[in-house]
């Protein structure tokens, strides 16, 4: 006898929780696969679940039990109101990074500016900026060719005209004069490995997560490279780790003594943004 949707989902959720996993993950994956919102779920939850859907759910459940990220299972993640393709070559976009995008947009109008996003990954930052500011010239750089392939797919799917470059830091565009530098670079130190969720440690690309010199290496590189490229009134927007505020304040102040350096907190009250304006 076929089981009803809510019975299967309740069982799956409880099973995950009994294994110490996030029970809601299976609900999220199921609703995304069905294309249902919460209202549609309430309308259909008492209906019988077809056998093939139950088999798919059990396959997804087995993956979630190994800490495989739900976003990789689905091949997509939501960011700043848009759906982005993701895979194991890209970091999964985080809600905290939306605050970086929001802060940059709030401070800069839709006038012709040259904007460079370093370590673009899925292209989430670059694409979100371009869609919100069509007059900006947005350049996106990544060291991973596989990540750039995904970023290009996202830009095309969402209709964002981005210039993409493969390379290290700002080197691919060293001759440019830029108005805005924005980056969410690898900033986790090896000592912080134990703080990461198992799903992040196991499946997300380590080159997009970890950096040498207590997680500061990429900031040091970008700040150094930007000094010959950033226009006199140019601005810098970095996402940072929660323990890096003081270090970024010092690095940016030393390189740009004429600018106002701000360390701003995220919605959780942790240092999250380093800004030079």
From Swiss-Prot:
Top enzyme class: transferase
Domain of life assignment: Bacteria
Pfam families: MTS, PrmC_N
Protein's GO biological process: methylation
NCBIfam families associated with the record: hemK_fam, RF_mod_PrmC
Record HAMAP family: RF_methyltr_PrmC
Family the entry assigns: Belongs to the protein N5-glutamine methyltransferase family. PrmC subfamily.
Protein name stated in the entry: Release factor glutamine methyltransferase
Natural source organism: Enterococcus faecalis (strain ATCC 700802 / V583)
């Amino acid at each position: 006898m076929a089981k009803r949707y809510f019975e299967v989902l309740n069982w799956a959720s409880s099973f995950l929780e009994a294994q110490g996993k996030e029970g809601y993950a299976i609900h999220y994956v199921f609703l995304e696969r069905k294309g249902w919102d919460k209202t549609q779920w309430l309308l259909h939850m008492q209906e019988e679940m077809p056998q093939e859907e139950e088999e798919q759910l059990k396959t997804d459940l087995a993956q979630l039990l190994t800490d495989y990220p739900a976003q990789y299972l689905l091949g997509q993640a939501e960011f700043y109101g848009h759906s982005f393709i993701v895979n194991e070559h890209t970091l999964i976009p985080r809600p905290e990074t939306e605050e970086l995008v929001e802060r940059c947009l709030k401070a800069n109008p839709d006038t012709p500016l040259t904007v460079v996003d370093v370590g673009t990954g899925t292209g989430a930052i670059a694409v979100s900026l371009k869609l919100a500011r069509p007059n900006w010239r947005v350049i996106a750089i990544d060291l991973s060719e596989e990540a750039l392939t995904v970023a290009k797919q996202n830009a095309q799917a969402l209709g964002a005209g981005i210039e993409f470059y493969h390379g290290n830091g700002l080197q691919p565009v060293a001759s440019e004069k830029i108005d805005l530098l924005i980056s969410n670079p690898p900033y986790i130190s090896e000592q912080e490995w134990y703080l990461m969720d198992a799903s992040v440690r196991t499946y997300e690309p380590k080159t997009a997560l970890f950096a040498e010199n207590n997680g500061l290496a990429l900031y040091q590189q970008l700040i150094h490279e930007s000094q010959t490229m950033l226009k006199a009134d140019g601005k810098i927007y970095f996402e940072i780790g929660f323990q890096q505020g003081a270090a970024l304040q010092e690095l940016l102040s030393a390189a740009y003594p004429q600018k106002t350096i701000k360390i701003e907190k995220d919605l959780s009250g942790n240092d999250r943004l380093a800004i030079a304006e």
